[in-house]
Amino acid sequence: MVLERLRRGGEPEDPRYAALSPQERRILKGIADGLTNRQIGAELYLAEKTVKNYVSSLLHKLGFTRRTEAAVYAAERRHTERP
């Protein structure tokens, strides 16, 4: 945890993002990449309905109602994260 903060320059991690499971984070990345549920499912070897369930869960955890809000959030995270 401390090493992760140092890698990010000492800034605290967003607790909403920290609450996401690794699979939800992968799906969030797919959303940010502009992929459909079907495309995300094909990439992650999941059924489209399963992806839809994950999307609903991650939207709830992030406090969003729209997929586009999640895409903007993920894009902003990418922009502010350090390599």
What residues fall within each predicted segment?
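Short, flexible helix-to-coil linker/hinge segments that flank and couple to helix-turn-helix
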Residues: M1-A18, P22, R26, R78-H79
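Short helix-capping/turn signature of helix-turn-helix
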Residues: A32-L35, A75-R78
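Actinobacteria-biased recognition of intrinsically disordered, low-complexity terminal regions
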Residues: E81-P83
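Residues at secondary-structure transition points
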Residues: P15-P22, G30, Y45-K49, N53
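Charged/polar positions on well-ordered alpha helices
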Residues: E43, V72-R77
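Recognition helix of helix-turn-helix DNA-binding domains
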Residues: G34-E69
